[in-house]
UniProtKB/Swiss-Prot annotation:
Its main location: membrane. The keyword Heme does not apply. Residues 1, 56-69, 140-147, 201-244 are periplasmic. GO terms for molecular function: ferrous iron transmembrane transporter activity. This is Ferrous iron permease EfeU. Belongs to the oxidase-dependent Fe transporter (OFeT) (TC 9.A.10.1) family. Pfam families: FTR1. GO terms for cellular component: high-affinity iron permease complex.
Amino acid sequence: MFVPFLIMLREGLEAALIVSLIASYLKRTQRGRWIGVMWIGVLLAAALCLGLGIFINETTGEFPQKEQELFEGIVAVIAVVILTWMVFWMRKVSRNVKVQLEQAVDSALQRGNHHGWALVMMVFFAVAREGLESVFFLLAAFQQDVGIWPPLGAMLGLATAVVLGFLLYWGGIRLNLGAFFKWTSLFILFVAAGLAAGAIRAFHEAGLWNHFQEIAFDMSAVLSTHSLFGTLMEGIFGYQEAPSVSEVAVWFIYLIPALVAFALPPRAGATASRSA
C-alpha cells in the first residue's frame, strides 16, 4: 500500500504542479478565461491513463500462466526504466520547468483560430506523461502485491496530491519541493531495484531465464515474508527471504550505479528547485 501511495503522491504532485503553474500563469497574464480549456486537457489525460490501465489489467488476466509471467517481467522492466527516468529527469528540468511551461502556453495561445485546441493538447501531453508513468508502475506494483490495499494506497496518494496541489495554488502552504523530490527519488531507486530483481524472477518462471538460480541466502529464520515486517518489506522493496543468485546480482547491478549517479552533483542549470 505504501509504495503505490508514495508513487501516486509524487506523480500526482508533479501533475498538480504543472496544472497549478499553468493556471497561475493564465491568471497573471489576464487570460483566466482559458483555465476552463486547460481543465479539458487535464480531464482528457486522466481519462486516457485510467482507460489504458483498466484495459491492460483486464486483458492480461486472460493470458496463460507462462505468458502472464512474461508479461509481468516486461511490465516490471518498463516500470524500472520509467522510474529511473523520472528520478533523473526531474533532477535535470525542475529548475526550468516553470519557464518551459509558460513558453509552451504562450506558443499554444498564439496559434490563430486553433489556439484553444493547442492549449488543450499542450496540457493533455504534459499531464498524460505523468499519468502514463504511473500506469506502468502501478501495473507492476499490483502484480507483486495483490488485494485491495495497493489500489487503496494509490487512490489515497492521488487524493493527497490533489489537495496539496490546490493548497499550493491558493498559497495555503509552502512545500520544500527540493527536499521532497530528493528523498522520494532516493526511495524510488530502492523500489526500482526490487522491481528489477522481480523481473528476473518472472522471466525465470516464464522459462526465459534459467541461469544462476541457486539460492543466494536464506533469511526465512530471521525475516520471513510471512511476518508483518517481512510482508511490508516484500510489498515495498520486493524483498525475498530466499532469493536466487541472479536476483541478488540484478539488484546490486541496478542499484549501485543508480545511487552513484544520484549522489553526483547535477549539471549546471539542472539543480532542483528549493520551494514553491
